[in-house]
């Protein structure tokens, strides 16, 4: 079981540099490359810190390449020798230490949108994340189903059809997560039954959004056959069990409950908490003492 956190490291006080279109227009792709290299250097620094602190699961930032899919960015960044050199270093560490690395595209990457242009841009973003995760030696691209658009069953079908039309490389890495407002665990399992996408279970989202049906963990586990160790998300509500907002830390109660329901199932757990690595470290140490 590997425990991890997402993107930023509060102890290192890391930041990932972004770029405005106007600045890119004025300074050219050289500026995009400059910031990209700094972001990869930050990622490498975090990877080293994680290894020093026995954290073997990490979600890389989606913002490593500024303006990654914007038309102004005509830089073939994934083939740039400097990018290849630093990502080779990152990937070597990831592979040598069996660290799991994932990415999580943002809310505007919506495969099941009824608007073809939104789907087109979503696929572009997934292609960017696919290139990024391959260079980093990662394995997972986490995505939500999207919107219901007044007809949840049709929305599920659209997601499945869009998924099946993706490149084999993206399909190999894409995992579908239940969300906290619209698509329950049962819903994403329904989508899996259409297109075989693995299901990333988020226990806090389930607490906030469920139909009262008990979670079938064996069914979730089965969706990962051929895709490696299941990935699970955990967070604690800021002011209550079903508060959609994330607390700075994950509570001992919530973590122990997840371990209880998992039983003998081996899974990697992503902590989604405002205090990032600080939320993970106590539980890493706890597991190491067992």
Where are these regions (language model features)?
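Active-site groove signature of glycoside hydrolases
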Residues: 136-150
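Short acidic, Gly/Ser-rich segments with clustered Asp/Glu that frequently serve as metal-coordination loops
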Residues: 183-184, 204-210
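Residue-level "edge-of-site" marker
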Residues: 63, 106-107, 146, 205
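Alpha/beta catalytic barrel-like cores
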Residues: 1-100, 107-122, 130-140, 165, ...
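Short beta->alpha junction loops/turns
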Residues: 148, 180-181, 276
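Multi-pass alpha-helical transmembrane bundles in non-GPCR membrane proteins
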Residues: 152-163, 174-178
């Amino acid at each position: 079981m590997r425990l991890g956190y997402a993107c930023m490291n509060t102890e290192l006080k890391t930041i990932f540099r972004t770029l405005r279109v106007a600045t890119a227009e004025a300074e050219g792709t050289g500026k995009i490359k400059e910031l990209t290299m700094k972001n990869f250097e930050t990622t490498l620094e975090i990877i080293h810190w994680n290894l020093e602190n026995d954290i073997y699961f990490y979600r890389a930032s989606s913002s490593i390449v500024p303006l990654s899919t914007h038309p102004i960015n005509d830089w073939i960044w994934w083939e740039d020798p400097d990018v290849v050199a630093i990502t080779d270093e990152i990937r070597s560490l990831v592979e040598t230490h069996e660290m799991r690395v994932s990415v999580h595209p943002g809310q505007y990457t919506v495969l099941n949108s009824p608007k073809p242009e939104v789907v087109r841009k979503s696929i572009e973003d997934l292609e960017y994340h696919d290139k990024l995760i391959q260079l980093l030696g990662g394995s997972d691209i986490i995505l939500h189903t999207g919107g219901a658009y007044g007809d949840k069953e049709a929305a599920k079908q659209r997601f499945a059809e869009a998924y099946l039309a993706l490149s084999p490389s993206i399909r190999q890495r894409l995992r579908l997560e239940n969300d906290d407002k619209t698509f329950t665990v049962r819903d994403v399992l329904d989508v899996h039954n259409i297109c075989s996408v693995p299901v990333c279970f988020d226990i806090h989202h389930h607490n906030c959004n469920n139909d009262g049906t008990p979670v079938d963990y064996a069914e979730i586990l089965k969706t990962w056959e051929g895709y490696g160790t299941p990935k699970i998300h955990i967070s604690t509500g800021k002011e209550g069990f079903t508060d959609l907002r994330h607390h700075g830390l994950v509570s001992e109660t919530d973590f122990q409950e997840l371990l209880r329901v998992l039983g003998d199932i081996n899974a990697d757990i992503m902590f989604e908490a405002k205090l990032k690595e600080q939320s993970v470290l106590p539980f890493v140490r706890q597991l190491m003492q067992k």
